[in-house]
Structures are given as structure tokens and as C-alpha cells.
Regions:
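Catalytic core of membrane glycerolipid acyltransferases/transacylases, capturing the structured
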Residues: 111-182, 210-220
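A broad structural signal for alpha-helix termini and local helix breaks/kinks
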Residues: 19, 38-39, 53-55, 173, ...
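Short, contiguous strand/loop micro-motifs
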Residues: 33-34, 92, 152-153, 218-221, ...
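Membrane-anchoring hydrophobic helices of lipid-metabolizing enzymes
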Residues: 1-119, 124, 167-168
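Residues that cap or flank secondary-structure elements
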Residues: 38, 96-97, 157, 224, ...
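Non-catalytic C-terminal accessory region of glycerolipid acyltransferases
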Residues: 134, 167, 171, 182-302
């Protein structure tokens, strides 16, 4: 039954993905308005997060950021549906994402055993599976093959939704016959077993610690005392990975710039806490640059 349900939902998404992106944005705007105005979806959470993160910002300015955030949330949904049936050529032709510094990535990746990339919920994280299909600002290709990418995710409670989201995020890779998603509980075993193979492990790292995960205080982030998980940097330190921060800036509707910022060459030479502190400093800088670009509905500070 699960397989049938997954195939039905995936079939609908792939069919919808063939429609123009402009149509999806139109529907996304309706979704955003309903989420913000009609259903007030986590509106209190958004406003509390914003007011505590920007204590000097006036209430009207906070409301404006919230409005822009919900519009962005609608765009994320629209782009995720459009992405679900897109191959590399379609992603490239659309220009939806541009990698700004492929040379920096290539130099670090090719000179180290493997790499850990610490991603965020800025921009549109649902588009990460198309990394190899995106344009670069210099024309230099990213020195990476399909089977070298691993994106870490937390398994959803609903098995159908979990499988749909997993396949949707890796649609472009699925089209060429591979996949990239690995559940967080299995990543250490996989990385150790494949330590002799150069790979990139992409970790979304800015969530509140999972229920069963150890909580580590990191100090202030966005003016609030923050607990973090150290699993991503722990893996990097244990296996001597290089580490990069993935910045995803929303330039305008339908245009993102992806920049990979080097954090260290050999994580085993750094403390896990220092790496994580550096990550949150970079994230705070990114959020301050474009406040509406982050996922404010997330209960980051519980």
C-alpha cells in the first residue's frame, strides 16, 4: 500500500511539475496569503522569533519581514513542486540557482579525503538535490559526480510523506539512476564504511536538537541562548573531513545564489564546539543580510 500511495503522489507531483514555474508562483502566492491571513499558520511563532531575533526592530518592520517570509514560503512550495520532475537540463536552463564559487569548492574537495557541507534553512533547501545541474558564475564545472553526494535528512513519522519528500528532493539524481538521501541515524555507519571514497555529506544543521539528541549550549545566536546538535561536525572531526558552509541567498523570485564558504581544511584539528560556533556566526550574518530568507516557522528556541 505504501508503494502504491507513494507512486500516486509522486505521479501527481511530476505531472504538476511540467507546468510553467510562473503558474506555480501564482499558486504559491495564494498559498502564502492563506497561510498568513486565513489560517495564521504559526504566525505567533514567526512574530515571537522575529521580535526576539531583532529586538531593535519596530513592530511594523517586523510585520513586513513576516509578510515577505510567508511570500518566500509560498515560493519554496512552488519551486519544490516544479523541481519534482526536473532534470539537469531544465534546472540549468531555468537559471534558478547559480553557484558563485565553484573553484573554491573544487580546490578544497579534491585536496581532502571527503567533505562535510553544513547547510541551513535559508533560501530553498528543497533544491539542494539539483546541485550538479546548476549554472556556475564562472563557467567552471563543479568537480563532483552523482554518486559522491549524500544529503542527510531526519525521517518523517508518516512513511508515505517521508518517501515522497525523499524522492522529490533527489528527483534530478533519480532521473539519472542514483539517489543521495541518507537518514541521520545511518549516516555515521555509512560514512565510516565509505571513508576510502571521496564524498560530500550535506547536513542541514540549524534545527533545534531532536528529542533523543544530546543538547550542547553554543551561547547566543540571534540574541538568544541556543542549544545545538554536534552530529555533523562530530562526523567531520572523526573522519578528518574538510568543512564548508553553504550560503543560499535569494536574489529575487526564481533566482538564488549558492556560495560555499570554507570553514576548515581538516576538522580533526578543531574542536567540535568551535566549528559549530563558526557555523552559527555565519548563519547569523546571512540572516541579518536577508531576514525573510530563513525558516521562521521553525521552533528553534524551545
Amino acid at each position: 500500500m505504501k508503494k502504491i500511495a507513494v507512486n500516486i503522489v509522486r505521479g501527481i507531483l511530476v505531472a504538476l511539475s511540467k507546468l510553467p514555474l510562473k503558474f506555480h508562483y501564482f499558486m504559491g502566492d495564494i498559498f502564502a496569503w492563506m497561510a498568513r491571513v486565513v489560517f495564521r499558520y504559526r504566525y505567533d511563532v514567526v512574530m515571537i522569533n522575529l521580535s526576539r531575533s531583532f529586538p531593535d526592530m519596530k513592530y511594523k518592520a517586523l510585520q513586513a519581514v513576516a509578510k515577505d517570509f510567508y511570500r518566500h514560503l509560498g515560493e519554496i512550495a512552488a519551486e519544490a513542486i516544479w523541481f519534482s520532475g526536473s532534470d539537469y537540463k531544465r534546472l540549468y536552463d531555468s537559471g534558478i540557482v547559480t553557484v558563485t564559487n565553484p573553484e573554491d569548492f573544487n580546490e578544497l574537495f579534491l585536496s581532502t579525503p571527503s567533505m562535510t557541507v553544513l547547510s541551513t534553512h535559508c533560501g530553498n533547501w528543497e533544491l539542494l538535490g539539483g546541485f550538479l545541474g546548476y549554472r556556475t558564475s564562472t563557467g567552471v564545472k563543479v568537480a563532483l559526480e552523482e554518486d559522491q553526494i549524500r544529503v542527510v535528512y531526519k525521517q518523517l513519522t508518516n512513511p508515505v510523506a517521508d518517501e515522497v519528500f525523499k524522492r522529490n528532493r533527489a528527483s534530478a539524481l533519480e532521473i539519472v539512476g542514483t539517489s543521495c538521501e541518507i537518514e541521520s541515524m545511518n549516516i555515521l555507519r555509512h560514512a565510516v564504511a565509505n571513508r576510502d571514497k571521496r564524498k560530500v555529506y550535506i547536513f542541514p544543521t540549524d534545527q533545534h536538537p531532536y528529542t533523543k539528541a544530546a543538547k550542547h549550549p553554543i551561547g547566543e545566536f540571534m540574541h538568544q541562548q541556543t542549544n545545538v546538535m554536534l552530529g555533523s561536525v562530530g562526523l567531520a572531526c572523526r573522519l578528518s573531513h574538510s568543512v564548508m558552509y553553504l550560503k543560499m541567498k535569494r536574489v529575487e523570485r526564481g533566482r538564488y545564489e549558492m556560495t560555499l564558504i570554507p570553514m576548515c581544511v581538516n576538522a580533526s584539528e578543531m574542536k567540535q564546539e568551535d566549528l559549530m560556533r563558526k557555523y552559527y556566526d555565519l548563519l547569523q550574518e546571512e540572516i541579518n543580510e536577508t531576514p525573510a530568507n530563513w525558516l521562521w516557522t521553525h521552533k528553534r528556541w524551545k
